[in-house]
Amino acid sequence: MRFTILVLLMLVVISIISLEVSSASWQAYNDCVYEKGVQFLKKNVTTFGLGRGNPFPEEGNLLQFKDGKDTGVVVSFVEHKSQGNTINWAKDGATFNDGSDAFKVFNDIVDAGGNMSYNDGPKWHLDLIISGLDPQALYTFVGTVNLKGGAGYKERITNWKVLEADGFEYACSVDAHKIGDGQVEFSTGENSEGLVAKWTDIGPGKDGKFIIRTGHGIGEKKGGIKGAHEYKGYAAGMFMLMYQGPRAVNPSRDRISTIWGRLKRDVKIH
């Protein structure tokens, strides 16, 4: 009898673990600047963007790359202007070096060409608002851009921030300039080395939202890259969002022990 109960309890534990694992992750990709007939566009990659000349919507729902299912996640671009020209939707050709971080994430999925540029003065920024998220789940974000302008464009720096998130882990490229766990900079005027802004284990706020903010470099005095241009830096090029799964209250091993102990207590197995 006890053996039968033990077997049943083990099956219950396995079922609970399997149920948690079955919450399969998904990935969604967005090409912020897609030029029809010139660049490739993979099926289920969205093309939301912003800027002068942009023919696509500034907001919409992301699709699961694998099967095209609607993720229910809404992305929207909001520009905070400074002066002069606003962000331009530019179709410059670009690539990333083989084996680079950007290459590993985006190669053969999102065309590296194109960028969303900058305003003609300091203090502009672009918010990528990601909403419709599950507050009880975790996500990964990866973003990058490359004008591929050569050495003369290295001073054109992009500052990336993650905002309004309930926790995250810094996972940006090793050679990127880390300012803090939620802030990083690297050159986007020349980024053939394929640096990326990446955060994992992002917990959305209670409103199911977090924001990725891009702008020009903040300057050396504020902890940014030395010699960064006063206002030139590229706002966006492409990004990937991944659903990791539900937040875990405890690590898996502790969870199994807790479930097993509770079941033993409830049925008084000795």
Over which residues does each language-model region extend?
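Positively charged n-region of N-terminal signal peptides that target proteins for export
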Residues: 1-5
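Bacterial N-terminal signal peptides
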Residues: 7-16
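Boundary/junction segments of secreted and surface-exposed precursor proteins
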Residues: 17-57, 246-261, 265
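Contiguous ligand/interfacial binding patches
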Residues: 24-46, 146-245
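Surface-exposed, low-complexity/disordered Ser/Thr/Gly/Pro/Asn-rich loops and linkers
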Residues: 65-131
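Short, flexible loop/turn segments at beta-strand junctions in immunoglobulin-like
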Residues: 130-134, 201-203
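A short beta-strand element within beta-rich, extracytoplasmic domains
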Residues: 135-150
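Residue-level detector of buried hydrophobic side-chain packing
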Residues: 139-143, 239, 263
